[in-house]
Regions:
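Beta-strand-turn-beta hairpins that frame and shape the catalytic cleft
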Residues: 1-8, 13-15, 179-188
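A generic structural motif
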Residues: 12, 138, 276-278
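A solvent-exposed, charged loop/short amphipathic helix patch at secondary-structure junctions
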Residues: 17-35
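Short glycine/proline- and charge-enriched loop/turn segments
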Residues: 25-26, 72-80, 149-153
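Cys-nucleophile CN-hydrolase/nitrilase-fold catalytic domain and related Cys-dependent amidase chemistry
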Residues: 33-137, 142-143, 218-233, 237-240
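CN hydrolase (nitrilase-like) catalytic-core segments centered on the catalytic cysteine
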Residues: 84-105, 186, 191-281
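Short beta-strand scaffold segments in enzyme catalytic cores
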Residues: 106-108, 121-124, 178-180, 262-264, ...
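Active-site catalytic loop in hydrolytic enzyme cores
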Residues: 113-207, 220-230, 291-302
Length: 310
């Protein structure tokens, strides 16, 4: 498949009965399954819309089954973590992938069955509904900007050991930066904060990625200023397509605005958004063009000087 129609979601928490005050979040402790179900149903409709529009791969947003809860510390949200292979989110996404013959990259809140640890994880599901593997967020942020604070380290830790079973569908020598041989191409994933670390895109490209999906929940002036620049630079340097998906709008009760601006970019610039839906972006990616000579005359892999690498 040379030209791949790809889509990503750009949305926010779909559960309508959120409290108006942060102090009242505790009232949701018995509604966590309802929150997940509302977001699964919302994203199912977006997946169906994208598939009907011809998308063959659909990337969902970071922690898509829930509001972005890491704006504060509240252990209540720990109960949303689920098994990456058998939990309700992956189960429903696998069924949708098989039914609509699409690849789905589904970022969830994972509880590891082996270690009982919690992680921020993207599950990669092929178009037959099978789970090819997962990517676990490698870099976990905490900090404050001019708009608010975030502390993801309270909710999950970084990937720090091999976690995919050996498979000819999982490519690359670095087990923390897997690339997946899907039915539509070689797909890599980086999650939000990972995009700021140069070795992530480089490692995924070196492992053969043709498309890197980068789901995020991001806000703040610097993040917004760098959002497009980082992806454009990485796509040009590493000769890959990149899809950056951000939340859009606000989520009660935190009311932190997310700037959206989700888009696809390739080695030669931004890709046209073909979507007619405000919560989706979609583009046709010419994967075959990645093997053609760069029109700029660049050949960074050939001309790299290994003598100055650390």
């Amino acid at each position: 498949m040379s030209t791949l129609r790809a889509a990503m979601t750009q949305t926010a928490n779909a559960y309508e009965a959120m409290p108006a005050r942060i102090e009242d979040l505790h009232t949701l402790s018995e509604q966590l399954d309802d929150i997940r179900a509302a977001n699964l149903d919302h994203h199912a409709q977006l997946i169906i819309h994208a598939a009907n529009a011809g998308a063959r791969i659909i990337g969902l947003g970071e922690l898509f089954p829930a509001p972005y809860f890491a704006l504060g510390r509240d252990a209540m949200w720990h109960a949303l973590a689920e098994d990456a292979c058998t939990g309700p989110s992956t189960t429903q996404m696998c069924a949708l992938a098989a039914r609509h013959r699409v690849v789905i990259v589904a970022p969830i809140y994972e509880r590891c069955g082996r270690t009982n640890g919690r992680l921020n994880t993207a599950v990669v599901i092929d178009a037959d509904g099978s789970v090819l593997g997962k990517f676990r967020k490698a870099h976990i942020p905490r900090g404050t900007n001019e708009q608010g604070s975030f502390d993801e380290s309270f909710y999950y830790g970084p990937a720090n050991e091999s976690y995919n079973a050996p498979s000819d569908k999982v490519l690359g020598l670095n087990p923390l930066l897997p690339v997946f041989q899907t039915s539509v191409g070689r797909i890599g994933v980086s999650i939000c904060y990972d995009r700021h670390f140069p070795h992530v895109a480089e490692g995924l490209a070196h492992a053969g990625a043709q498309l890197i999906l980068s789901p995020a929940v991001t806000f703040g002036a610097k993040s917004q200023r760098m959002w497009e620049i980082e992806f454009e630079c990485d796509a040009a340097r590493h000769n890959v397509f990149i899809g950056g998906s951000n939340r859009m709008g606000v989520e009660s009760p935190w009311n932190q605005p997310y700037f959206g601006a989700s888009h696809f970019v390739g080695p030669n610039g931004r890709c046209t958004n073909l979507s007619d839906h405000p919560n989706l972006v979609m583009a046709d990616l010419d994967l075959g063009s990645l093997g053609a000579p760069d029109p700029s005359g660049w050949n960074l892999q050939r001309d790299r000087n290994p003598g100055i690498d650390r």
